Design a protein with these regions (language model features):
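Basic helix-extension-helix modules of the SAP/HeH family
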Residues: 1-142, 152
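Interaction-mediating elements
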Residues: 149, 155-157
Length: 163
């Protein structure tokens, strides 16, 4: 989880800047958890840039991995717009958005709250796909394997061609 010192930050920072705060191993682990591969032989800055471009190019990598509550949280970020912090009660376990370094978090320990800020480029990448991801999660609550996703895509394709 990437923490910030106050809520004066604006959301016009880049995802690669968030990744640069992490170690190279942490970045590789994030991408591995999303069932993708990134070479561990790259320099840290290149690893951060490549990981950010993978997520921004295919936001469904992340959206398919989130549970329904976190997808609703992403929808809140999308609807809130730029420079808007989403406030949640602190939990023992961070959200996946925090674990994957997709938000910067200010920890208000007195109020026991997290003030989360999502970079504009991440919010804009998620925006066109969030409703589809929520509908998909309603239909298939558990995470699907690559084989199951392929079968669903094939069935959808066949159904469209038979109509």
């Amino acid at each position: 989880m990437i923490t910030i010192k106050n809520t004066d930050f604006q959301s016009n920072f880049r995802l690669s800047q968030l990744f640069n705060v992490l170690t190279k191993d942490e970045i590789v682990k994030i991408i591995t958890k999303l069932d993708e591969y990134i070479s561990p032989n790259l320099k840290k800055a290149d690893t951060a840039a490549r990981a950010a471009s993978m997520i921004l190019y295919d936001p469904m990598l992340v959206l398919e991995d989130l549970n329904k509550d976190e997808l609703k949280l992403v929808k809140e970020f999308v609807e809130a717009g730029a420079n808007q912090y989403i406030i949640r009660k602190q939990r023992k376990t961070p959200y996946k958005l925090q674990k994957y370094a997709l938000v910067a978090t200010y920890e208000d320990d007195k109020a026991a709250q997290w003030h989360m800020l999502m970079p504009d480029e991440v919010r804009e990448a998620f925006a066109p796909h969030i409703d589809e991801a929520l509908a998909f999660k309603e239909k298939f609550p558990k995470k699907l394997t690559h084989k199951e996703k392929s079968m669903i895509a094939l069935m959808d394709y066949l159904n469209r061609n038979n109509e």
